[in-house]
Amino acid sequence: MLCLVAAAVEGACDPFPPVASVPIVPTPPPVAATVLVEPAAGAQAILSLISTARLSLWMQMYLLTDDRAISALAERAGAGCDVRVILDPAPYQDAGANQAAFDQLAGAGVDVRWSTSRFSYTHAKTFTVDHARLVVLTLNLTGAGLGGNREYAALDDDPTDVGAAETIFAADLVGAATTVPGGRLVTSPESTRPALLALMGGARVSLALETEELTDPLIVDALLDARARGVAVSLTWPGPTTDAGASFLALAAAGAIVRAATAPPIHGKVVVADDRALYVGSANLTPTSLDDNREMGLRLDQPATAAQVGATVAGDVAGGATP
């Protein structure tokens, strides 16, 4: 009461002081990723990403046989960079395929390890640089991957994506389970199929795909559903035309444009929806890739990038052969 009287007389005491407003800080949009298209970008565009590492380079790689890539990793380790590499122990069911790379890297002081048996294959092809950049590849570091295949490389400097990739890497390095963080990074066996089904299900005008394999029934059904609602579906795979499986033939019968493309050989894995959104990553459209492997990719809402990749797929489709 005394306070109220004093406030009325002198304005010296406010029994109900104003509450300071808390500014609402909007969440910043993700940093736009850049997608390189191979073979046009050239091998050096990929190799130079390794050479830029100064503090750290953490890599998961299905197949590593290219001498230039192995030397670049060894050189970075020799310069004091924290180089860690996870290799699949038997890519293409060949237990010796990565052995030479493993031995050379170990001899150069790289922390190199065989991937965990938690996955059928560690088919991911990714690395982070200096805890600041994530590189998601469709290519293996091989002569073919760096020397003529149709491939894609996504360069992603978004801190959320980089942090998610390094969280997964740290767990995979020791074979531990982890909760996969959210964001644009999608992984198998956790989130690739849901991300792809949502991307395909959201298409209204067009879907353009490049894949080595297409056998997953849910993915095939999503593409057939897209055709049924009038979406233009086009896709390429490596061929030859005589190897077209039931899924490719079913899509062709439903009106999709299906082509076997060999110039350049198709090894990239991309899905482009309406030239506005895309997936780029390591996953083939098979149950093994989606359910059993370690795969990594990015789901991007970037119309300019989607249109760029979509134009590449369209060119490959135009140059392909009908099964």
PLM region descriptions:
Residues 1-7:
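Sec-dependent N-terminal signal peptides
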Residues 9-12:
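C-terminal motif of bacterial Sec signal peptides marking the signal peptidase cleavage site
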Residues 15-53, 60-203, 217-225, 229-277, ...:
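HKD-type phospholipase D/PLD-like phosphodiesterase module
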Residues 211:
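Catalytic toxin/effector domains delivered as secreted proteins or via bacterial secretion systems
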Residues 315-323:
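Charge-patterned, long linear interaction tracts outside catalytic cores
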